Amino acid sequence: FNEHVRKELEKIDENLDIDIYRDGLTIYTTIDSKIQGILEESFEKHIQKNQEILNKEFLADPGKLSRAIEGTNFDKDEVIEILSNNKDIPKELRDKFLVQGAIVAIDPQNGNILGMIGGRQEKEYLNLHGFNRATQAKRQPGSIFKPFIYMTALENGYTPTTQLLNQPLVIFIDDTTRWNPQNHDGSTGLLTTLRYGLKKSLNLISVRIVQELITPRQVVKKAKSFNLSTRIAPVNAIALGVSDVIPIEITSAYGVIANKGIYNEPISITHIEDQHGRVIKRFVSEQIEVIDESTNYIMLDMMKDVIDSGTGSKIRWKYKFNAPMAGKTGTTNNKTDAWFIGFTPQIVIGVWVGVDDPSISLGKRQFGSVAALPIFADAITDIYEWGSFNSGSKIIYLDNKENWAAPNGIVEVKICKETFDRAHDKWCKSTTEIYLENHIPSKNCQKHINAFTKYKE
């Protein structure tokens, strides 16, 4: 974090006509030391577990091991000795053998960076002036990109109960190339709602949204409005998150969803004082609405399901974190990148785990829910147990019952659990769904009314 602040200061010293190294300035940062410590503790605990899993993967696959040491001065026996005993990874091997990661914690209401980790923290790996993966790494996001797919569909008039077929499809890239996307577990199904598709991170539903409801270019436009600086390619595979993102930027984008659709640029400095104690510069993040509050609320509500009963539910049943929360798991093809980003009304935390060489798999079972989520879960649990944090000059008190309030324009409707049409009070098994007031379903459930009529006859 300190290195990130130094680089930020170097960007502004010429504009302020100051010398950050000689003028005796006092720099006030956004960091909360307690949150930073919690992030470091959770990161170190779980990154070592991920390292041990990767070591075993290499040991179980001699071909993978041989390919990874090509061009190095190490022979296979030397590397096997290192991995078998979980020894420190030598510098020459770290690009392919060392599990790395990044964490960013942000106050979504003002953009203050509360904590940051840009790589391994152990003494033998720590490089204070090196590559900060939180702010510099460009990695495939996988399924954590899917909220941009779904919110684009919501903005185009579709709803949480819009149904698409959870079946394989073939997409022709050109005359000779076909793409056959699959769900991560190879499963298929019948008509599936958008809410369920996001909750279970079904690739086939995400792909069909892009094929049948919206276009890749619409998704790119939406994602770029959240200030993602990397190139997002308008291709069919955008549905599965194939274009690189930077951890701090995608975490900040999730902060928009936590903050009623309003974007705050991440900031690391609150103000600067000269040697006489005079404030010479204050930093305030500009607030920009990038998605309508009501549409954002529906997106938020769908992402809460990910935590309550979807791919992120381990936070509930294993880690016993019960505060209102939303988020998304992410895993890339071949498990090269594992992500989890989660948020409450007060804080958003993004976690990325991977190897610097993006061709190296973390392991066959290293999904985002396995490799990244535990880092988040331990951190958020400890932060809420602590009960508060400092954000600029304010103390934010954490309430594990504080939830997001529905804005104007949101309507609750009883729908049939089977047909997803308006429920008949007496004959349908119903549930409550939320809609924008101008997209309320108009069709009544005919299946159960007709069945009742037939029964009477």
PLM regions: where:
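A penicillin-recognizing enzyme superfamily signal
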Residues: T29, S33-E52, K56-D107, G115-I117, ...
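Conserved catalytic neighborhood of penicillin-recognizing serine enzymes
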Residues: Y158-V219, Y263, Q275-D305
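Sec-exported extracytoplasmic/periplasmic mature domains
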Residues: R6, E10, E14, E40, ...
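Proteins synthesized as precursors that undergo proteolytic processing into mature forms
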Residues: E124, L128, R139, L154, ...
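Non-catalytic, structured segments within soluble enzyme domains
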Residues: F1-N50, E57-K64, I209-Q211, K221-S225, ...
